[in-house]
Structures are given as C-alpha cells and as structure tokens.
C-alpha cells in the first residue's frame, strides 16, 4: 500500500475566489492593432465598483471563471485574457458606465461570427454582478476582417448586374404577408414590377406554409419577373426567401432559385442564425445570386437602451457573415431609427473606412480593408411624401422599399409602383439640379404629381399619414 500523501497548506496553486479586477482590469494596457475592441454599456449592481464590473465582463467573455482553477497554470493568461482597459461614466446616468475591453485575436476562430458572438455576447450577459449590459460597438481589426468573405457581391457588382446607376433602387414587400396562394402572389409581384419597381420581396415570415409552398411561389414569381422584364426592358428581381428549418433545406431552395435564373434570394439572418447565413452567402457568391437580408428579431436584441446588442454591432456582423442588402430602419417611417444613429451604422455598412464619431454612436475607427459594402434598405411605413427625405438621408446607394405605400394605392399595385417611381425620379432630378430636398421636398412631389395621375392619387391618400413617436434608442 502506498503511503498516505500529506497535503500542506500553501503548496500547489492558491485556490479560492479573488476579485476580477486584480487580473482583468488593466488601465495601463496599450491596445494592439490586432485586438478586437468592445465598448459595453454596463449597469453594475448596487455596491459593485465599476472597475470590478468591467473586469468581470472582460473575464467572463474570455478566459475567466468564478474561481481560481489549477489549469490556469497550463496556459498563458497574459496572452489570452480579455482586458478592461478603460471605464468612463455615461453622462446623465447615475450608475452606468462604458467599459472598453480588448480581446486578443487568437481567442476567435477565423471567419466565424458564431464563435465571435458566443464569447463576447455569451454567458456574460446573465452575470449576477451586473444589472444590465449592452454591447454598443466592436472594432474588428483588419487581420480578422480578412478571414471573412463578406457580402456575396457588394454594391458595385450589384449595380453592374442590374445595369442601374445614379439613383436608389425601389422595392415593395408583397402584402398581405400571409394567406395568398402562389398564383395570386405571383400576380401581385408582376403588377408591381411592370409598374416601375426594381424589386419585390417575400415578407420575412413567408417560408413554405400550407397555403403557399415554396416551390410554387418560386415558380410563379419567376414567371412574373420574366414577363415584367420583357415588357419594361429593365432587369427585375424578387427576394425569394430561402430561410428554412435546416441549412440543407435552405440551400436546396437557393439552388432552385439559381436554376430558375432569378437574380436574388433572401434570408432572415437572426432567426436563421449566423452559421446558416454565412453558408448561404458563400453559396450565393459561388453561383451568382444576390442576397437580401431581413433582420427579423433584431428589436428583441437591440431596442432596449441598457441591455442587449446595438444594431450597429449586428450590422457589422452581417457585413462579415455576408449579405448584399439589409434592412436598416427609415428615420421617417413607422419603425425605430434615430437619424444620426441610423446614418452611423449605414456608413458602417457601405463605406470602406469609418472614423470614430461618438456623436453618431461610433466608438471605434473601423477599416474594412476593401470588404464589399452592403446596401441599406429603408422599409416600414413609408410612402410618396417621404421620398424627398429618404433620397436625401440615404443617397443613391440604398433600397427604398414601399409595401403598403405601393399596394395601398387606390388604383392597384401597378399604379402604386408608378407613383413611387415617378416620385423617386423627380427627387433625383431635383437633387441633381441642386435643389434642397429637405426644404423643397413637398413642392417637388406636388410638381411631379401634375404630370402623373398615379402620383397625384397617392399624394391624396397619404397626405395625413404620420408616425410621430419618439425613438427609444437615442444617443
């Protein structure tokens, strides 16, 4: 029998619980070009110092756990740990702080938004020492950006595919969103496209339900696209929603869209998941399909000011995962979107290099190192009277999507599409002539309506419609 081993106090590693800030709060740390940087809005529980709370965020989203473990000695914590390197109080709030955390690049799998989010916005958001936690922004270093394919094609390639330049693109979501048969659905698509729209769209919750199976919808929509193209001489598209219960089924639907020769498919990237979205994005690039992204479920994640993830982070994640369009709010319609905040993440979607600008909620300078851009889609409660503001706010590289603002026209879908196209062309021409859309917008629409009975009828229907609620998420 082997002799009993005596355990002496003080030998081996020192077990027990110690303050996170002793290891993970490092105010003297100089960030590296390869670090992923995060800005968290945190609300500590009463009695928890902000330094301890910030260090806890850094620890629990990287290498730390609640107690010292002996396997800490088998690796280099200094190399792999996250570091809370700065904390600043939030102006106007009693117990709220912005904690800045730096993460070494080696903590994350290359080309995986799924792995990135699993760490940075994982279990730490349920940590008891925090009353609330929100990820406000991420700085993605060029070294990590280069591991992603990004959008299947990007803005310039899409314009070349469509042969459409110098103006925003026009779209429409087919309504009612649920309940139409495939044939009636295709008829609605055709009427909108022949009236002058560039795209029509499946609603986000149109997948493959008993009233309209996906294959039937794809066929009737393809017929509508080809017929409208033949009549107008323009390239048309319909966002065929490939979102499905499994990745295999999703890719099967995308493959069928490719066989039909249509230009674009669609995915609900948050409900579908980043792994599925990245897989579909790769398929779309390999097979020449554009990819429209809907952000269903985003408000569950980003609408509360103190807890969750800001949409600018979700937008950056989408640009890495891949998508050629994404819904971004309207500023002027029925859905959430404060102007400066919205324009901040619109720039993060489209531009190659974006400077830090706290007035627009951009916490870090972001260099996308030529990753293709994403077209923002303005959609939700917009109509012809909004056209000047939308053209001025979003510029040419955008998609303006009028659902009820097309299909609600008193004369039908095609006249509704005509009204929107005439309004857009009038606004673009006025802007190119140097007129101020913000000041003269209503007059520009009225002048155009004199020569377009369809636009005049639309102006009359929606002259009193306004959505004047204050945005919840402001700077």
From Swiss-Prot:
<comment type="function">
    <text>RuBisCO catalyzes two reactions: the carboxylation of D-ribulose 1,5-bisphosphate, the primary event in carbon dioxide fixation, as well as the oxidative fragmentation of the pentose substrate in the photorespiration process. Both reactions occur simultaneously and in competition at the same active site.</text>
</comment>
<feature type="binding site">
    <location>
        <position position="379"/>
    </location>
    <ligand>
        <name>substrate</name>
    </ligand>
</feature>
<feature type="binding site" description="in homodimeric partner">
    <location>
        <position position="123"/>
    </location>
    <ligand>
        <name>substrate</name>
    </ligand>
</feature>
<dbReference type="InterPro" id="IPR017443">
    <property type="entry name" value="RuBisCO_lsu_fd_N"/>
</dbReference>
<feature type="binding site">
    <location>
        <position position="295"/>
    </location>
    <ligand>
        <name>substrate</name>
    </ligand>
</feature>
<dbReference type="GO" id="GO:0019253">
    <property type="term" value="P:reductive pentose-phosphate cycle"/>
</dbReference>
<dbReference type="Pfam" id="PF00016">
    <property type="entry name" value="RuBisCO_large"/>
</dbReference>
<dbReference type="GO" id="GO:0004497">
    <property type="term" value="F:monooxygenase activity"/>
</dbReference>
<dbReference type="GO" id="GO:0016984">
    <property type="term" value="F:ribulose-bisphosphate carboxylase activity"/>
</dbReference>
<dbReference type="InterPro" id="IPR000685">
    <property type="entry name" value="RuBisCO_lsu_C"/>
</dbReference>
<keyword id="KW-0120">Carbon dioxide fixation</keyword>
<keyword id="KW-0460">Magnesium</keyword>
<keyword id="KW-0456">Lyase</keyword>
<keyword id="KW-0488">Methylation</keyword>
<keyword id="KW-0601">Photorespiration</keyword>
<keyword id="KW-0113">Calvin cycle</keyword>
<feature type="binding site" description="via carbamate group">
    <location>
        <position position="201"/>
    </location>
    <ligand>
        <name>Mg(2+)</name>
    </ligand>
</feature>
<feature type="modified residue" description="N-acetylproline">
    <location>
        <position position="3"/>
    </location>
</feature>
<dbReference type="Pfam" id="PF02788">
    <property type="entry name" value="RuBisCO_large_N"/>
</dbReference>
<feature type="binding site">
    <location>
        <position position="204"/>
    </location>
    <ligand>
        <name>Mg(2+)</name>
    </ligand>
</feature>
<feature type="site" description="Transition state stabilizer">
    <location>
        <position position="334"/>
    </location>
</feature>
<protein>
    <recommendedName>
        <fullName>Ribulose bisphosphate carboxylase large chain</fullName>
        <ecNumber>4.1.1.39</ecNumber>
    </recommendedName>
</protein>
<feature type="binding site">
    <location>
        <position position="177"/>
    </location>
    <ligand>
        <name>substrate</name>
    </ligand>
</feature>
<feature type="active site" description="Proton acceptor">
    <location>
        <position position="175"/>
    </location>
</feature>
<dbReference type="InterPro" id="IPR020888">
    <property type="entry name" value="RuBisCO_lsuI"/>
</dbReference>
<keyword id="KW-0934">Plastid</keyword>
<dbReference type="InterPro" id="IPR036376">
    <property type="entry name" value="RuBisCO_lsu_C_sf"/>
</dbReference>
<dbReference type="GO" id="GO:0009853">
    <property type="term" value="P:photorespiration"/>
</dbReference>
<feature type="binding site">
    <location>
        <position position="173"/>
    </location>
    <ligand>
        <name>substrate</name>
    </ligand>
</feature>
<keyword id="KW-0503">Monooxygenase</keyword>
<comment type="subunit">
    <text>Heterohexadecamer of 8 large chains and 8 small chains; disulfide-linked. The disulfide link is formed within the large subunit homodimers.</text>
</comment>
<dbReference type="InterPro" id="IPR033966">
    <property type="entry name" value="RuBisCO"/>
</dbReference>
<dbReference type="InterPro" id="IPR036422">
    <property type="entry name" value="RuBisCO_lsu_N_sf"/>
</dbReference>
<keyword id="KW-1015">Disulfide bond</keyword>
<feature type="modified residue" description="N6-carboxylysine">
    <location>
        <position position="201"/>
    </location>
</feature>
<comment type="similarity">
    <text>Belongs to the RuBisCO large chain family. Type I subfamily.</text>
</comment>
<feature type="active site" description="Proton acceptor">
    <location>
        <position position="294"/>
    </location>
</feature>
<feature type="binding site">
    <location>
        <position position="327"/>
    </location>
    <ligand>
        <name>substrate</name>
    </ligand>
</feature>
<dbReference type="GO" id="GO:0000287">
    <property type="term" value="F:magnesium ion binding"/>
</dbReference>
<feature type="binding site">
    <location>
        <position position="203"/>
    </location>
    <ligand>
        <name>Mg(2+)</name>
    </ligand>
</feature>
<feature type="propeptide">
    <location>
        <begin position="1"/>
        <end position="2"/>
    </location>
</feature>
<keyword id="KW-0560">Oxidoreductase</keyword>
């Amino acid at each position: 029998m082997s002799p009993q081993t005596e355990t002496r106090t003080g030998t081996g590693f020192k077990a027990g619980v110690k303050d996170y800030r002793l290891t993970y709060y490092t105010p003297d740390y100089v960030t590296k070009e390869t670090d992923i940087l995060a800005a968290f809005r945190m609300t500590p529980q009463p009695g928890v110092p902000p330094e301890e709370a910030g260090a806890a965020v850094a620890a629990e989203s990287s290498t730390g756990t609640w107690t010292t473990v002996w396997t800490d000695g088998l690796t280099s914590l200094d190399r792999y740990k996250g570091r809370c390197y700065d904390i600043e109080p939030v102006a106007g709030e009693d117990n709220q702080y912005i904690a800045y955390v730096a993460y070494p690049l080696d903590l994350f799998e290359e080309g995986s938004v799924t792995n990135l989010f699993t760490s940075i916005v994982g279990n730490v958001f349920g940590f008891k020492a925090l009353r609330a936690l929100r990820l406000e922004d991420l700085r993605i270093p060029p070294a990590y950006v280069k591991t992603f394919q990004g959008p299947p094609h990007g803005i310039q390639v899409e314009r070349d595919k469509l042969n459409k330049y110098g103006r925003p693109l026009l779209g429409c979501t087919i309504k009612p969103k649920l309940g139409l048969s495939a044939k009636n659905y295709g008829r609605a698509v055709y009427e909108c496209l022949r009236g002058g729209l560039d795209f029509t769209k499946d609603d986000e919750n149109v997948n493959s339900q008993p009233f309209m199976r996906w294959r039937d919808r794809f066929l009737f929509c393809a017929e509508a696209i080809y017929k409208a193209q033949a009549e107008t001489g323009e390239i048309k598209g319909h966002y065929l929603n490939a979102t499905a219960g499994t990745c295999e089924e999703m890719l099967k639907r995308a493959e069928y869209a490719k066989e039909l020769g249509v230009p674009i498919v669609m995915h609900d990237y948050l409900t579908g998941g980043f792994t599925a979205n990245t897989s579909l994005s790769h398929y779309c690039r390999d097979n020449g399909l554009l990819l429209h992204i809907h952000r269903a479920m985003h408000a569950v994640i980003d609408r509360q000011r103190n807890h969750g993830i800001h949409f600018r982070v979700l937008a950056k994640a989408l640009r890495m995962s891949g998508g050629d369009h994404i819904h971004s709010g309207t500023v002027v319609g029925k859905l959430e979107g404060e102007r400066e905040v919205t324009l901040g993440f619109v720039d993060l979607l489209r531009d190659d290099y974006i400077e830090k600008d706290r007035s627009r909620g951009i916490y870090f300078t972001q260099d996308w190192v030529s990753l293709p851009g994403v077209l923002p889609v303005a959609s939700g409660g917009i109509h012809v009277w909004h056209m000047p503001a939308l053209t001025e706010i979003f510029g040419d590289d955008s998609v303006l999507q009028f659902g009820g603002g097309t299909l609600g026209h008193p004369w039908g879908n095609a006249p509704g599409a005509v009204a929107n196209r005439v309004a857009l062309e009038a606004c673009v021409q006025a802007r190119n002539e140097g007129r101020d859309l913000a000041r003269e917008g209503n007059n520009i629409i009225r002048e155009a309506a004199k020569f377009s009975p369809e636009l005049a009828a639309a102006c009359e229907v929606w002259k009193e419609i306004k959505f004047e609620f204050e945005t919840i998420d402001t700077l």
